[in-house]
């Protein structure tokens, strides 16, 4: 065994080789030495456990190949682009919505330059970082003011902490939602230091339930849009307008959390209906929150619009600084909102709405091309077909609503062959992410962006 240990080269020796010099030139001395030490330690452990040399230590060539691979891996970003063929357009685990070209350009410019983030150029003095997006949101929603934080859960937390700390918040039992990652509305309330008061039942809540729960310690009435589930059958709920009237009677504000929400009428785009921000503001609700990276089609952000007196208090709360957005997000969000000033162009310019509104004829053409490209790469074990599919918006928006779509399905006599193919797809430069159902792999073409890049990759592999 001692002879095996003596086969491990010293780092000084590696440093003096031409291959070592090349790697140092490319990656730097510190990175080279650090990886060489790790490799040597792994070689020692392998010899100790197996009484043999590891494969990478068989020759000097294999050793430097391993070192090169490890150093290159250090420089590679692990969060690589993937092709989303799951049929879920706003897939939370795959990053949700894609930014428009204008939003990308605005964000990139902000990365490369100083910007007037909190500076009024005309007045030559300090301004507020939410100013530009607030002006746009006022114009688009009819609200008096707006506030932006880094996600919608943060928006809810900020509203609760500002107005309900040490007090009670009344909410329907049927609206105590849980979003992704076991993150629940009651948990957010607990973090904000307020007491949850549940009223009604899971399927039925009446205005009198809210009225009977109001007392001197009530902070506000809360309405939460159940975006990621739906209760059907014998149901009853209270509208924002009814809650506003009740709130005015007792001088209590009403806050609404829309989750996804939209600035345009989804039904006008032949899509399932989703709450529209303008309508919620018009209902008289004091504050409404929604997400920037869902149906809006922009960066992750929690957007709050409503009465100026309440927005001003949110802006002054210490949590606002903790939860605020940076110049990159605000630039991307501003560019996204500007698309809504030109509603006739939304489906052409916002990738999310473009994917959701593709015609079946367009999807048929894509599915046929994808099938041809895949058939050139797969062997006799796999059967490829084009089949009707049902896509979803995703990210908790309209979970029971399906959107007609098409998919290339792949089946095999052995499930192990499909699992092998799934692993193969994940090794591609841009991994292909599909879904499994009915013992088939489904590649739904509605949810995939950069379709031409996908076809090019398959043809060039």
From Swiss-Prot:
Enzyme class: transferase
InterPro entries found in the cross-reference section: PyrdxlP-dep_Trfase, PyrdxlP-dep_Trfase_major, SelA-like, SelA_trans, SelA_trans_N_dom
Annotated keywords: Cytoplasm, Protein biosynthesis, Pyridoxal phosphate, Selenium, Transferase
UniProt main location, coarse: cytoplasm
Gene3D superfamilies named among the record's database cross-references: 3.90.1150.180, Type I PLP-dependent aspartate aminotransferase-like (Major domain)
Protein's pathway: Aminoacyl-tRNA biosynthesis; selenocysteinyl-tRNA(Sec) biosynthesis; selenocysteinyl-tRNA(Sec) from L-seryl-tRNA(Sec) (bacterial route): step 1/1
Location of the protein in the cell: Cytoplasm
An annotated GO BP: selenocysteine incorporation
GO molecular function (one): L-seryl-tRNA(Sec) selenium transferase activity
UniProt KW Cytoplasm keyword: yes
Cofactor(s) annotated in UniProt: pyridoxal 5'-phosphate
Any one annotated GO CC term: cytoplasm
EC number: 2.9.1.1
One matching Pfam family: SelA
NCBIfam families: selA
Function recorded in the entry: Converts seryl-tRNA(Sec) to selenocysteinyl-tRNA(Sec) required for selenoprotein biosynthesis.
Name under which the protein is recorded: L-seryl-tRNA(Sec) selenium transferase
Organism: Glaesserella parasuis serovar 5 (strain SH0165)
Gene: selA
